[in-house]
Amino acid sequence: MKIVVIVRTRDESRRIGPFCESYRWADQVIVSDGGSLDDTISIASRFPNVLLRPFGERVQLANGLWRNNDSGHANHLIACANELAPDWIVYDDCDCRPNRLLREAGRDLLEGTDADFALAVRLYLWGTDQHFPHMAKPEPAHERWEPSLWAWRGPLDFWTVDKPPAYDFRVGDTVLGDVHLSHRVLDILPPLCLLHYSWDDPARVDRKVTFYRESGFIPAMAHPLTFAGPLNPLPEWAGE
């Protein structure tokens, strides 16, 4: 069974090494870089299962800032993955990676299921030893884990469409809502999980919030400490 991981990058020298390391168990990791000025590409190229596929489409924003087109970048990656005829495509951000338990079980889970999609719970970290539990349990009582998209079967006609400030997932012409209503789904729950490191460095969080506001991409961008809920210590089982 061929498992292909796809990831977008731009100036991710802090994260691309740990990301690629966490997916050594995959057959290929396709890194599509959108114009890094740091060492992202050279770091990624050190991993034997990594393929580099550049992406050049830019969206000009306010104050001379720019970013890569989100859905265009994602669709480019999906097309590159499909060229390899994968059985599964795993898609995530460079700042999100599987914990040790999911890393160890990931291949067996995908090889052993007849599902069309695999969903996993993401723990959103603050620093490196705390997380926001309500982000992983967003329903009103905050009691039930809510997994989100992690992987899909390669043969599916899966793609994305811009819906600023993010994008929609689609299968064919159908917008993908709750996949449990339309497809066979493997829900991966803790202690197996994904660790989202987008907020692991408070100073970088401040810079990211400033970028979104000053670029006009998300003018009302809020700081996670104001909307993500209370903080809990990171559970021992969540370790890498």
Cite the ranges covered by each PLM segment.
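Active-site-proximal specificity loops/subdomain of glycosyltransferases
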Residues: 45-91
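Cell-envelope/extracellular polymer assembly enzymes that use nucleotide-activated donors
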Residues: 2-4
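A conserved acidic beta->alpha catalytic loop
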Residues: 33-46, 57, 93-96
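Short beta-strand/turn micro-motifs composed of small residues
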Residues: 7-9, 33
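Catalytic-site signature of metal-activated, phosphate-bearing donor transferases
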Residues: 64-79, 97-240
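Short, well-formed alpha-helical segments that are part of the catalytic scaffolds
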Residues: 11-25
